[in-house]
Amino acid sequence: AEDHATCVVVQPDGKILVGGYSLCSEGNCFTLLRFLDDGTLDPDFGEGGIVITEYAGGYTLEAKVMALQDDGKILLAGGGAGGFAAVRYRANGTVDVEFGTDGLATCAFSAGSDRANGIALLDDGKIILSGYSANNEIDSIAVTRFTNDGIIDESFGSGGRVCAAIPGRRTIGQALAMG
């Protein structure tokens, strides 16, 4: 198996979440682990401390960022050939199927590869993802906004999306800061 850890968050209770992606049967899938403060896997989270989330149809998921919502739910985001992707988990590691479609919220910018590398949670519960969209060797900074339910917020940008490219430059969004 091929596994990649790409992000870490410490929960208020001291438990450590590590997100990333693994090679699964139909491509890459989101992987989430939770460790107790002594470094052992949390047996009360997922299956023995590990959650692997794979969606049918070959939707490749490479997690890059993670955030904790005020209610304890966990957002793991990244993307791939199908666009930006975010999966929301309950505090026990089960997928929150009320988010997006069966727990998965997506936003495609182009026919190419789109990846979210930044995440921010707004006070009103909305979720902002930033990263890049690569199509025909033109890379653009890409930003989208979802509602707290995992639906693209059509009031943001053009149809919930914003893209910006610097002519003659490879433009990739790597982080997101809110203030």
Label the predicted regions.
Residues 1-179:
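A sequence-level/structural motif corresponding to short, flexible coil/turn segments enriched
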